[in-house]
């Protein structure tokens, strides 16, 4: 489970409750883009934004914590590999309402970008359950989504 807040994080008690529920269900919890918050909450890891990724010269957490990264191109994927992240999320594969105007990669480009990578990569961007077979056929670890799952 990824806790992601683009504006302002909810109250600490709300985050602690969310982590408790996720862990009770057997899920690990990573915090998106806020290393200090991830460490304060004793989360299971951090998910780096592409901006965070570009600014780093070393993995920001020890190997016992998850470290993921958002990537949008070959350079960001290469940097994620060099930092030793555990997984990447590559986007946008398709057009998405959450990032209007972003040029979609398409499945062929997605497949080419991840073909030789030594880490799992999730597909993101305008995707949902119906896209999982296509993602898997392109060697993705799976699909990640916001809108397709959040509104359920």
Model-derived features with residue positions:
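Conserved, mostly hydrophobic/aromatic
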Residues: 1, 38, 80, 88, ...
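Structural motif
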Residues: 41, 83, 116, 137-139
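Conserved beta-strand positions in the central sheet of alpha/beta enzyme cores
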Residues: 2, 30, 47, 68, ...
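A short beta-strand-loop structural module common to alpha/beta enzyme folds
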Residues: 1-8
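Short loop/helix-cap segments at secondary-structure boundaries that form the rim of catalytic
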Residues: 37-44, 56-63, 78-83
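Alpha-helix-loop-beta-strand connector modules within alpha/beta enzyme cores
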Residues: 12-33, 50-53, 57-73, 103-128
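Histidine/lysine/aspartate-rich catalytic loop segments that bind and position anionic ligands
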Residues: 67-97
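Glycine-rich phosphate-binding active-site loops on the catalytic face of alpha/beta enzymes
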Residues: 49-59, 87-101, 126-152
């Amino acid at each position: 489970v990824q806790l992601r807040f683009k504006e302002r994080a909810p109250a600490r008690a709300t985050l602690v409750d969310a982590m408790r529920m996720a862990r009770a269900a057997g899920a690990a919890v990573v915090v998106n883009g806020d290393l200090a918050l991830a460490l304060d909450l004793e989360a299971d890891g951090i998910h780096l934004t592409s901006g965070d990724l570009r600014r780093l010269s070393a993995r920001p957490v020890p190997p016992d914590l998850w470290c993921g990264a958002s990537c949008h191109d070959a350079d960001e994927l290469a940097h994620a590999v060099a930092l030793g992240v555990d997984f990447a999320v590559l986007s946008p594969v398709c057009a998405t309402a959450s990032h209007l105007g972003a040029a979609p990669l398409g499945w062929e480009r997605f497949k080419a970008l991840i073909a030789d990578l030594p880490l799992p990569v999730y597909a993101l961007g305008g995707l949902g359950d119906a896209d999982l077979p296509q993602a898997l056929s392109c060697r993705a670890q799976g699909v990640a989504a916001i809108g397709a799952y959040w509104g359920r």
